[in-house]
Each structure stands twice: as C-alpha cells, then as structure tokens.
Amino acid sequence: MDQTVEHSGTESPHGDRQPTRIQAINREIILDAALEVFSVNGFRGSTVDQIAVRAKMSKPNLLYYFRRKQDIYRAVLEHTLDDWLAPLEAMNADGDPIEELRRYITAKLAMSEDNPAASRLFANEVLAGAPVVGDFLATRLKQLVDVKARVIRDWVDRGQLAPVDPYHLIFMIWATTQHYADFDVQIRAIVGRQVDAPGFREQTAQAVLSVVLNGIRPRD
C-alpha cells in the first residue's frame, strides 16, 4: 500500500521549479529507504522495486522523483556527504583549537553511531573506486579540506597546537570515528553486548577525544 503523500502533478522534481513541501517529504522518504536497501545489498544487488517496497510507495510514484536507480544512489551519497561536511564547515578559525576539534570529533562520532548505514554505504563506494561520487570528492570535499587544513596549520604556527600535518590529522579523525560504524561487526565480535550497554558511547567518545586531543595539545 502506497503510504506516501501523493504529488500534485503540477511540478516535476526533474525540472527547475522549487519542489513543493509534499515533494520534499516524499524525496526524503525515498532517500531514507534507499539508504537502508543500498547499505545492505550494495548498488548492484539493489533494485528500484526493493526501494519502493521499503518506502511503502508505488514504483511509478518513486520513478516520478528519480528516473533511475543510479540517480537514487547518487542522491543518497550526496545527502550523506552534505551531512558529513556540515560539522567540518562549522570549524571556526577564531575559536579555541582544542574545543573546535573536540566539537568536530564529537559530531563525527555521533553521526557514525546514529547513522551507521550511511557510513558503510560511503565506505563501500570508496572501496569500489568512488565511481559515482569521485567528482564530488575531488572538488567540493577537497576544497573544504584544503581550507580547514590551512586553519589547522595556522593554529600550529601560532603555537596553539603541537606540530602536526593537518591532512593526516583530518584523515585520522575520519578513520577513527567512522571505524565504529564500518567495523561494527568486528567490534561486537570482540566486546560483545558491551556495545549496547549504557555508557559505551560515552566511553568511546572519551577514549577517542583523549588520545587525539592530548596528542595535539601544545607542548610545554
């Protein structure tokens, strides 16, 4: 049964007009459903029919918003990257370096823990050579990382952080925070039910923040 709100038919998401509120809601429903399907089955193993079923939407209604499976897949990945870039963009060059990095790491950990499917989907895309979002990585992502690397380098030059290569610091933050989503099965195999125990997320954040931030605090 199609449980989405019916579109009016007067405006097409494929056109240049601003989407209506109903269209925006249905688009989010599709992207959420597609994320779950793609993260489990991968791009090749997923079908539009599976996504439509997950979204509780008819296939023709879904195809009104996205013409092809490839279009849905790209939209899901770009939506994920937009969310991930937001806390990096928010890093303030005029703020306290340790606190700015603390906020960034905390936000990245929360994203991995709250939406592990998105992290795993992105990891699979990159492992496949980023055939869909390679241009995004080489342009928008690179441009933002270059800007924030200069911010970190300025903090180091002013003695507000210990000497560290800004790119490797950013890579380390990504690797550490996304590990808890991408390698959830491995973590559960080692620590078992502790993963779901109260306080595990806080312990994770405390450990990661302690290691990273203590490693880059200015030396006396």
Identify the role of each PLM range.
Residues 2, 29, 37-71, 75:
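Helix-turn-helix
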